[in-house]
């Protein structure tokens, strides 16, 4: 399954647009680690905890996007966009939304 942020795939013409597919992934951030994240952010360092949670959420959202595209018998998802939300800094949560267009290739 090809996942692309572009609307076209070089050398792979699109035969049919099958519709919009979307997914989301919510990752909790360990409350104790979150304290250290805020401490590190205050001093300008990188937060491994937050980066790890974001990476895992993005990977899960991508896998779910692929699964939904497969249900439509798609070969690829184009125009993929990821949005990241942290609905509650106090709650220690990160949400990744992924959307794209499922397509069948020639």
UniProtKB/Swiss-Prot annotation:
Q: Which SUPFAM superfamilies match?
A: YbjQ-like
UniProt xrefs under InterPro entries:
UPF0145_dom_sf, UPF0145_YbjQ-like
Source superkingdom: Bacteria
Q: Gene3D superfamilies of this UniProt entry? A: Hypothetical protein apc22750. Chain B
By its UniProt entry, which HAMAP family does this protein fall under? UPF0145
Give the similarity note.
Belongs to the UPF0145 family.
Q: Kindly provide the name given to this protein in its UniProt entry.
A: UPF0145 protein Pput_2816
């Amino acid at each position: 399954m090809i996942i692309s942020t572009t609307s076209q795939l070089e050398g792979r013409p699109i035969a049919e647009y099958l519709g919009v597919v979307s997914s989301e992934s919510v990752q909790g951030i360990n409350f104790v680690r979150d304290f250290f994240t805020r401490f590190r952010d205050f001093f300008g360092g990188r937060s491994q905890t937050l980066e790890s949670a974001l990476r895992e959420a993005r990977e899960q959202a991508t896998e779910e996007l692929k699964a939904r595209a497969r249900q439509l018998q798609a070969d690829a998802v184009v125009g993929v966009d990821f949005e990241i939300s942290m609905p509650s800094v106090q709650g220690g949560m990160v949400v990744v939304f992924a959307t794209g267009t499922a397509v069948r290739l020639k």
